[in-house]
């Protein structure tokens, strides 16, 4: 199996995008603040790819799915229409992870929710930590908006791209959401 790779420049840092023949399967920041954090993310991504896409070869080649991802991100960062339905996603994971990722896509731009609220929405009231783990395993940053999940006290909690980026993304969405002429989503 071949996976196709491209680096996408964004206002908050370069992102590594990987697609399969089915669609986008990974979107990660290439740099993360903190000692060894970048290497940790790369190690985790490689383990995930080995588990869900065996065997695979990574090829540097632009594909229609990568072009659509690049266009989606450009629209998102410009504050114009960016609909997840415009993208084919190939997000492989455990059944509970997939349920959480689907729930994440229902959080409106500029709004946040807690791990506990997602657990309750999934009728798994005691599963806040499991929701957190699934959120952390989200392979498609920004597009599947794990950055919109916060702690039960309203505090910003972990984000694979770093808390500075999480803050930036939430603020970006709130700015565009409050502008009447903009249509972020």
Model-inferred region functions:
Residues 139-143:
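Major-groove DNA-recognition helix of helix-turn-helix-type DNA-binding domains
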Residues 1-125, 172-185:
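Basic nucleic-acid-binding alpha-helical/helix-turn surface characteristic of O6-alkylguanine DNA
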Residues 146:
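Short cysteine clusters
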Residues 152-185:
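…primarily DNA-binding HTH/wHTH and HhH modules…
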Residues 127-138:
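Regulatory, non-catalytic segments
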């Amino acid at each position: 199996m071949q996976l196709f790779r491209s680096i996408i420049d964004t206002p908050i840092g370069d992102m590594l995008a990987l697609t399969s023949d089915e669609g986008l399967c990974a979107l990660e920041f290439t740099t993360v603040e903190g000692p060894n954090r970048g290497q940790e993310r790369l190690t985790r991504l490689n383990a995930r790819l080995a588990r869900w896409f065996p065997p695979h070869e990574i090829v540097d080649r632009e594909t229609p799915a990568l072009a659509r991802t690049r266009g989606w991100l450009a629209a998102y960062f410009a504050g114009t229409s960016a609909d997840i339905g415009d993208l084919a996603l190939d997000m492989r994971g455990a059944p509970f992870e997939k349920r959480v990722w689907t729930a994440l896509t229902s959080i409106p731009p500029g709004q946040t929710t807690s791990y506990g609220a997602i657990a309750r929405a999934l009728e798994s009231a005691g599963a806040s930590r499991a929701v957190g783990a699934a959120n952390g395993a989200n392979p498609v940053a920004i597009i599947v908006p794990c950055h919109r999940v916060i702690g039960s006290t309203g505090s910003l909690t972990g984000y694979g791209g770093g808390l500075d980026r999480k803050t930036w993304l939430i603020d970006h969405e709130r700015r565009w959401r409050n502008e009447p002429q903009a249509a972020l989503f």
